[in-house]
Amino acid sequence: MVLAILQARMSSTRLPGKVMADLAGAPMILRQIERLDRAPSLRRIVVATSDQPSDDPLAHAMQAAGVPVFRGSLDDVLGRFIGAIDAFGPADIGVRLTADCPLADPGVIEATVALREATGADYAANAGERRTFPKGLDVEVFRAAALRAAAGETRDPYDREHVTPFLYRRPKRFALAFHHQAVDEGEVRWTVDRPDDLEFVRAVYDALY
């Protein structure tokens, strides 16, 4: 099974509470989940947030919407991902997504999942050393066994926070594959980190809804 894990928290330093910001009448994270639901390969979507009180409103909102939630360490996000896999598996493939990307593209997700399947890679992504997709369309696909190996071995705080560096920094150990497009849009910004980013995606959603 392919398990999508949507990483989310309320305590963003640059734009606190952004994942629950209103986007065309619904929380931004639920708008993103609507788009993820259009990716057929994602058999299940789980929101992975922290066990801190600051994330209680997020967890309660997801539960009210019928979205599965796993809660774990705020800083050890890698451990949180393993916990989500254990709680909502069995899953042999995981997909890492972050909840600040309400313009997520189901087609890009499907292509990256298919690339990992076709190559048998331990890790596949549409970013990396050469980014061609806009920031905000990022998707990472990994074998659950590879991520378990990372979680069992690394104690580096950077690896624990950012989940996958232990994999893509070891190309001699883990098989990697990268999805690129012909047109280079790597400098385009569709993610939501700042107030102006939120204004932009609100304008997009208002135009479409």
What are these regions (language model features)?
Residues 142, 160-209:
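Conserved alpha/beta core of the MobA/IspD/sugar-nucleotide pyrophosphorylase nucleotidyltransferase superfamily
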Residues 128-139, 183-184:
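A recurrent flexible, glycine/aromatic-enriched loop bordering the glycosyltransferase active site
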Residues 83, 104-132:
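Conserved donor-nucleotide/metal-binding helix-loop-beta segment in metal-dependent transferases, i.e.
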Residues 93-97:
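Short aromatic-hydrophobic micro-motifs that form the base-stacking/packing surface
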Residues 1-49:
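N-terminal glycine-rich phosphate-binding loop and ensuing alpha1 helix
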Residues 30-92:
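Conserved N-terminal catalytic core of the sugar/cofactor nucleotidyltransferase
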Residues 34, 91, 106-117, 144, ...:
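Short alpha-helix within the catalytic core of nucleotide-sugar-dependent glycosyltransferases
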Residues 74-75, 101-103:
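Acidic metal-phosphate-binding loop of nucleotide-sugar-dependent transferases
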